[in-house]
Amino acid sequence: MPPLSLLIKPASSGCNLKCTYCFYHSLSDNRNVKSYGIMRDEVLESMVKRVLNEADGHCSFAFQGGEPILAGLEFFERLMELQRKHNYKNLKIYNSLQTNGTLIDESWAKFLSENKFLVGLSMDGPKEIHNLNRKDCCGLDTFSKVERAAELFKKYKVEFNILCVVTSNTARHVNKIYRYFKEKDFKFLQFINCLDPLYEEKGKYNYSLKPQDYTKFLKNLFDLWYEDFLNGNRVSIRYFDGLLETILLGKSSSCGMNGTCTCQFVVESDGSVYPCDFYVLDKWRLGNIQDMTMKELFETNKNHEFIKSSFKVHEECKKCKWFKLCKGGCRRCRDSKEDSDLELNYYCQSYKEFFEYAFPRLINVANNIK
């Protein structure tokens, strides 16, 4: 097989935070089993062995949640042991982890650094913005713990990105958020659209990101980013980087920006495999990694159905001048009714207005980084 990438949930939906906008919480609430607990050692070894035996060239293990840190440091030390044990083909192995940061201490930071993990740290901006939606299970603020995690990552030279969820509130404070990240010298940023629960009415929650708010957010963020670029202070913002890749290469490395789905091989802690992190539902369970090869999982009827359903292009997109840049966007923003065709992207108008506003400057950046 070609190189393989997995998204793994070692603690299932378990988390020590209770973020108001958590999309995975809403997904797990709609499964027969809300949480599968911590991944057992036999599942971990079976997964590692299978991937290293079947992949060619390199492979990627990306740990998410819930909160993956809840699996414990010993779990990840065991992961490293198993990767060494079963890597007979001498593959290049990439490990990454997404965390809320509240449980990071010196030992965790040291481990992540020594084992070259790329880390995504969830932080929504300065204290008053971050704490609005990201509280722990007791309703307590989490900002100081997350800021401490960032300091430890810098101390131990852990490579990390900042993951910022864009809500109605954060969209209105993009200047304050960007300045804060700049003051902290965070150079790699991902701004992630806040998702309303799947198949619920969009825009009904206080945190819901409405199209008009997203339009303003993109324009304001781009102005700040572009000014820094002109001043020789380039900041990596994943969405803008993805647009530049599309302009220069015809496609993006970011999932959701190429218009059609691929199989992401999302592995729940019991070994169940799903095609996408946004669809870890009983309906889309492909099988179990303990019982099936990666090729068998990929070739299931459910996976083919999931991927094929993303191919249909909306009639509005066919005549849109921005389609080659947008490609219809992420499936999750086109899916509003269960068992029906995908619709026009919820943020279609936002993207149209943003492209009209920013495209000439995007081309200028692209020409300067060729």
From Swiss-Prot:
Pathway: Protein modification; sulfatase oxidation
Cofactor(s) recorded in Swiss-Prot or TrEMBL: [4Fe-4S] cluster
Binding-site positions, [4Fe-4S] cluster 1: C15, C19, C22
Binding of S-adenosyl-L-methionine, residues: Y21, G66, S122, R134, L195
NCBIfam families: PRK13758.1, rSAM_more_4Fe4S, sulfatase_rSAM
Residues reported in the UniProt entry to bind [4Fe-4S] cluster 2: C255, C261, C276, C330
Binding, [4Fe-4S] cluster 3: C317, C320, C326, C348
SUPFAM superfamilies assigned to the protein according to its UniProt record, in alphabetical order: Radical SAM enzymes
Active site (UniProt): D277 (proton acceptor)
Job description of the protein: Involved in 'Cys-type' sulfatase maturation under anaerobic conditions. Catalyzes the post-translational modification of cysteine into 3-oxoalanine (also known as C(alpha)-formylglycine (FGly)), by a free radical chemical mechanism initiated via the reductive cleavage of S-adenosyl-L-methionine (SAM).
Keywords assigned by UniProt, alphabetized: 4Fe-4S, Iron, Iron-sulfur, Metal-binding, Oxidoreductase, S-adenosyl-L-methionine
CDD domains noted in UniProt: Radical_SAM, SPASM_anSME
EC number in record: 1.8.98.7
Cofactor remark: Binds 3 [4Fe-4S] clusters. The first cluster is coordinated with 3 cysteines and an exchangeable S-adenosyl-L-methionine.
Enzyme class of the recorded protein, top EC level: oxidoreductase
Cross-referenced Pfam families: Fer4_12, Radical_SAM, SPASM
Name this protein carries in UniProt: Cysteine-type anaerobic sulfatase-maturating enzyme
Gene3D superfamilies: Aldolase class I
MF terms (GO), sorted A to Z: 4 iron, 4 sulfur cluster binding; metal ion binding; oxidoreductase activity
Radical SAM core domain location: 1-227
Stored InterPro entries: 4Fe4S-binding_SPASM_dom, Aldolase_TIM, Anaerobic_Cys-type_sulfatase-m, rSAM, SPASM_anSME, Sulphatase_maturase_rSAM
Disulfide bonds: none
Reaction(s) this enzyme catalyzes, per UniProt: L-cysteinyl-[sulfatase] + S-adenosyl-L-methionine + H2O = 3-oxo-L-alanyl-[sulfatase] + hydrogen sulfide + 5'-deoxyadenosine + L-methionine + 2 H(+)
Family: Belongs to the radical SAM superfamily. Anaerobic sulfatase-maturating enzyme family.
